[in-house]
Amino acid sequence: NESSVIVGKNQNTLSEINLDYIKENSIPVVRRQSGGGAVFHDLGNINFTFIASNNDNFSDFKRFTTPIIELLKTLDINAEFSGRNDLLINGCKFSGNAQYNYKNKVMHHGTLLFSSQISDMSNALKVKPIKFEGKSIKSVKARVTNISEHLKVPMDILEFKDLIIDYFYKTNTDNKYYTLSE
């Protein structure tokens, strides 16, 4: 999608965004049904979603993020799970994840920064001071990374998206493919 900011279900929108920058750049701000933190979307960001039956492991974020980590390993990128819902490369975040539960289903979704404009993200979102306690990191730019910066063989975002889809179908034959339309 074009640039937008998506805030979590329980967030105070004004405490998450740089309102002046948002207004100056006509960036839409929307609220999603799931929790989690505010995210900046642009054309360099890929979103993924898993919908599964809600069982004892529904809140296990590792269950849904492990396929992303394993895919990146095939590209010689060492990614890791961190905290409750983040994925990191070399200590820098490239993915945040959230979940929404309804009846007997869970929708797990995440962002993948592939070739996002980090400076735009940094300008659009406010960073909580607590994220910096005890750290010498001075900006969002120093704490996040794009997957494309770690690829041994360059590819564009469409090639990477196709790689994700192919990988999921090869590694899990139970996956169903849905094409959404208007």
Q: What are these model-derived regions, one by one?
A:
Residues 18-19, 38, 85, 95-103:
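A generic local secondary-structure boundary/capping motif
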Residues 1-2, 42-43, 89-91, 102-103, ...:
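Short acidic-glycine loop/turn motifs at beta-strand connectors
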Residues 1, 42, 83, 106-108, ...:
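A generic structural signal for well-ordered coil/turn residues at beta-strand boundaries
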Residues 45-85:
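Contiguous, small/hydrophobic- and glycine-enriched helical/loop subdomains that border
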Residues 15, 25-35, 63-68, 75, ...:
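Short acidic (Asp/Glu) patches
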Residues 1-58:
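N-terminal lobe of the biotin/lipoate ligase/transferase fold
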